[in-house]
Amino acid sequence: MVNSKQKGNSGERAIVKILNEFYNTNEFKRVPMSGAFSTIHKNNLTESEAHVFQGDIITPDFFEWVIEVKNVKDVNLYKIFTDCGHTKWDEQLEKERENIKNKKGVILVFKQNNREWLCKVFKKDFTIEVVPRMEFVDSYILLFSDLLNFYLNNK
């Protein structure tokens, strides 16, 4: 049986590696204990510390979004499509968006076993046109690699 915490941690490490290689840096890092850290310690964090511990990945100043990572056994894309792009993580993403400091928005990066990394971005967080795999009223779902290539090429 797979430990879901270990699976989540391995997903976060994979995204950190992808981002560091893509941007030729080592500034992307996992948030210690991921989302649990800021939940447990949020009252003891200064505003600048809280800024660093947004999402699952610590991002450099040049990177404009908070990143949430989900590495799961199954992703029901049919359900996402028939629910107008909504995922089971949307409530968490909206809470994250409400607390964002110094970033444009949230990117949900998710992966099903043995598949490529996908991502969900909200249209209100992007002022540029993204070429999506799926487009919905309020969001896009696309390959994470497409988002990186688009973002880097249109910065």
List PLM regions with ranges:
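Catalytic phosphate/metal-binding cores of nucleic-acid and nucleotide-processing enzymes, i.e., regions
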Residues: M1-K155
